[in-house]
Curated annotation (Swiss-Prot):
SMART domains: WD40. Keywords: DNA damage, DNA-binding, Repeat, WD repeat. The lineage of its organism: Eukaryota, Fungi, Dikarya, Ascomycota, Pezizomycotina. GO terms for molecular function: DNA binding. Residues 233-245 have a biased composition (Acidic residues). This is DNA damage-binding protein cmr1. DNA-binding protein that binds to both single- and double-stranded DNA. Binds preferentially to UV-damaged DNA. May be involved in DNA-metabolic processes.
Amino acid sequence: MGTDSTELSEFEKQRLANIAERDALLKKLTLDAQSSGIFPPKLARSSPVSQTKPKKKPAPKKIKKEGEAPVARRMSSRLRGIAAESEVAKRKAEEHYEAVQQAERAKRVRKSDAFSFSEMLVSGQKLSADGLIGVDVVTKGVAMPYQRTFGDEDIEKTADKELKRLREEVSGLQLWEAWEPNRIKVTPERIYTMTFHPSEAKPLIFAGDKMGNLGVLDASQERPVSSIKHEDGDEEEQEDDDDPDPVLTTLKPHTRTISSMHIHPSKPTHLYTASYDSSIRELDLEKTTSVETYAPDSPSDDVPISGIDMAADDPNTLYWTTLDGAFGRYDTRASRRTAVATWQLSEKKIGGFSLYPTHPHFFATASLDRTMRLWDLRKLSHDDPLPVGEHLSRLSVSHAAFNSAGQVATSSYDDSLKIYDFGAKGIASWEQGHTLSDAEMKPDTVVRHNCQTGRWVTILRPQWQANPQSHIQRFCIGNMNRFVDVYSSSGDQLAQLGGDGITAVPAVAVFHRSKNWIAGGTASGKICLWM
């Protein structure tokens, strides 16, 4: 019995070996057949849904521009006659890599030249000076698209009559209906900063993007109504002719991200743009030229600028902060070498700052080191700068915005908006050397707000209306649920603006300085406008 079981076991082993050998042979034959193209490719299954989809518009044919360099095609070393693992192959690969890196570095190098309109133009029409200016000089958040957190029911419950009236007024703002937001693409890349022109004659919006492009939208334009009737021809082509996109202009004054912009009310024809390419440029809106106003002495110095501001009573002095934690001041009327003053205020980046409009020697900074600090320029040492006071948040603070009433609004990654009322503490009468204790620096109001933007959405920053038409101060900020929220200085929500066609988060939100116009910019370079 023992012998039979032993022979059976050996037989079983042989049988399994034969099966394995056969499987290996079949696998090899299948692979050989596939590589020889014997087996036909698998056909995609047709679905009834795909058959009912409307026919997509054919992509426009690409026309090769004259003088355009041919695109380098990939080619194996064997076809180029280079032996595998040879020194020649290694050297050529290294040279190619270095050439690509050099080209990328060249694209990002700051250009200090003055630019004409044609040198900056990326797309769109030529800017007309008259037409352009218009002539008068919660717990940690998870985004839930289109889910409102404020609406008509909240307005109805408002007991304060003036607050209710303001809520109805701001909530009544309507999305610009001339074109859907997904058709108003003013910049090729993600919008980082926006501003309105101070003119009240018409809404004129400027948007700066990640790659240094500057988009311009004149929202006074009307959608053309075509009366042309086509008897034959392609229907889709006729629709395109009858329904053109809005007229936009895109320029490229910088080589890297435009981080901040400012138009001084007394110089409405000049737009200042600050960039990560370490420069501040001045765009003349009448001459449509751009000149470098400030940059480090050496073109190789990399000092990315994170914010820019100007005092209301001084159209000649620029103030800025950097990603290296520095604060700078420059009087453009004087020699650059003698008139530039800088202070190192933080070891980590300053993400945003603003001057106190009525007393510009006071300013507030927001930093990656989790602080909001209040400073006094009248008593600011270059060697050991000390703030008037500081408040530490749980996570980094993105921006600190001052309003004319002496209140500072900040946004922070701890999912909060904080409002500090220094006006009530008598900031306007403080003498040099005045300091605040930690208790006095605590925020007066904290509002829960989802600030978890992630990698692809621009950081949310509050922005006050400079000259509101009532005594109630208000600011706007993007909402991760694809809205723009408006709050009062006491933390009361005034509105949650949305609308059809908003397909991305309007993360960059700005108020017009005096009119109830609000614009939001998205990561796809598109604009939403409420008026």
